[in-house]
Amino acid sequence: MNPTQQHLADRVSGLTEEVIVGTDYFLVDVEVRGHKGTRVVEVYIDSEEEVGHDDLALISKEIGFLLDVEDVVDGSYKLELSSPGIKRPLTMPAQYRKNVGRTLRVRFESDGDEEIVVGDLTDADDEEIELELPSAERLQLPYTTITQARIELPW
């Protein structure tokens, strides 16, 4: 994102946090694409429970209202609100907790090298995750060492 898009993403993040405070939802990411008049603002929220379509519609309406009232986006724009989906990387502890029991592909740093492992996520707290590898070995990885983690699809 360029500086203008990053500034806009930061403003949208703040407004989204205001809308979802006190709910079970949390903000995962905001991405801004395009230029004045053709902007697309993508907001990703998640929950440790199922993300409901009715909730998404209501939250989207509230975010859109605040964006318009505060004149955050210069010109017309398209607001897209969704859950991150299975293909997006996991970035927050709550996302890991939600996916305990699933198989993950995790890229992490170890002694200055980058390694990749595939294993079943058996635990996740606010500091680290635990994977059970195919060898039955259990591996604890602090979030600070993880550079990317994705759900490994079974097909």
Curated annotation (Swiss-Prot):
Main location: cytoplasm
Top-level taxon of origin: Bacteria
Pfam families: DUF150_C, RimP_N
Entry GO terms, CC: cytosol
Subcellular localization, as worded in the UniProt entry: Cytoplasm
SUPFAM superfamilies hit by this protein: YhbC-like, C-terminal domain, YhbC-like, N-terminal domain
Entry keyword annotation includes Transmembrane: no
Leader sequence residues: none
Keywords, comma-separated and alphabetical: Cytoplasm, Ribosome biogenesis
Function: Required for maturation of 30S ribosomal subunits.
Family, similarity comment: Belongs to the RimP family.
UniProt protein name: Ribosome maturation factor RimP
Organism: Salinibacter ruber (strain DSM 13855 / M31)
Gene transcribed to yield this protein: rimP
